[in-house]
Amino acid sequence: MSKLYKAAMTPEVFAWAPASNNRALIAGKASYILNSVSAYRSGQKKVPEIAKDVYFVPPLRGPRGTRWTSEHVIYNYIIPKYSRNVDTAKKFLLALVENYDQAMYYSELYNSPAFFDTRVPKGNRGYPSVRGAKNMLDLHNAWFDKDPFALPGEATDKLKPLKDAMKWSTNVGHPGPANPAIGEVFGTFVVPNMMANAARGLKPETAVMQAETLTKVIFEKWRKKGLVGGTT
């Protein structure tokens, strides 16, 4: 990590917020980021010439030859038992699934469906019809093969590598399951801070030990709540 920082990064990365890599990319300061299509879409609108030079690839392979990346955003919909509108909420979720073609299109392919077998509703859907598209998977593949939001003169197949994202995407916490403890480790930046400390000169062994200590405290807290299994 220290070598990567010294060879390819600048001090500002230590103060990055969630959108900082987006801004660095469209400012022409970053050559590689790990992000969804949102950074690219921002570039198309704000700095078209930069966006035209942005491309997508699967995750880089690690030293063991595997390559994984975490899902960027996963929407979760929960209907509380105490809700006064349970039936209405269920109808809304069903309607959302049935009409996710529009969610895909109007999010400019930022959103992808969870249920690929869902049939595409008939009639005017508010976007140019896609010949032969019978279900959400057909639409998804057609749009990622030929991006309907590509700029004039821009390659339309840039998103094609993302069609196989399910093969190399996994949950935060892989190879274990996602759980509240993993969520807190992720949300409080335990691992990024470990990397940052090592990049700034802290002995790698010390950085790892500090991160391990914090992680154990977090897991123990959630074990006491009965929401994480295992032992210390």
Q: What is each residue range found by the language model?
A:
Residues Y5-A8, Y100, A198, L202, ...:
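A general structural signal marking secondary-structure boundaries and capping sites
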Residues A27-A30, D53, I74-N76:
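Extracellular structured ligand-interaction cores
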Residues D53-P63:
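Flexible, solvent-exposed loop/hinge segments that line or gate ligand/substrate-binding clefts
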Residues E184, T188, A196-A199:
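A short, solvent-exposed beta-edge/loop patch
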